[in-house]
Amino acid sequence: MVEYLDYYDEDWNFLWKETRENVHANWLWHNTVHCRLYTKQWDILFQIRADTHTFYTTASWHVLSGETIKQAFNREIMEELWIDIDSSDAEFVSVVPWKLDKQKSDWTWYRDRAKAHVYVDLYEWDFSDFDFDPAEIQWVAVVNAKETLQLFTRWSGEIQATIVTNNWIQKEMVGIDRFLVTQNETYLWKYGDILGKVISLSKI
């Protein structure tokens, strides 16, 4: 199925819709959603990507044409983890402009222009409910938000992660290098506001 995305000018005035391929081919500004699930125990869920084996968002992708951000949040969680949540009460964290210019192995350029809408939502069910595609998501990792924030602050040490697959759950110790950052990003810049939001909400 062809995906259509709404696209905008640099001042974020709506222009029209275009296929996802053409949006990227023509460097058009569009919306994405970054979904984070957390628990009342200050835990936050990361997916472990099958391609990079690093901790990333709980789920993320494009906001389709005509979708609201929260509708996209719900769809992405369903598509990637196969759980249906009520995202209407998801809490806003930030909007992050994203520009990427990357030369590929064939010497052509991949260019991305997006605004990432970052939200968190409370997850109150069992981790065994997950049913994800191992070709896309290797595992899901559950870490304590306070401990993770301290790890990013001191830049050393390890924290305990609960690793969840479709078949088993186990504990392991992980260091800062397991979390995904890209060029020119720091761990606190990428994850600090999210972790702070989860910590504040978990107190409620």
Feature-to-residue mapping (PLM):
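Acidic, metal-coordinating catalytic segment for phosphate/diphosphate chemistry
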Residues: 1-34, 38-40
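The catalytic Nudix box helix
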Residues: 46, 58-95
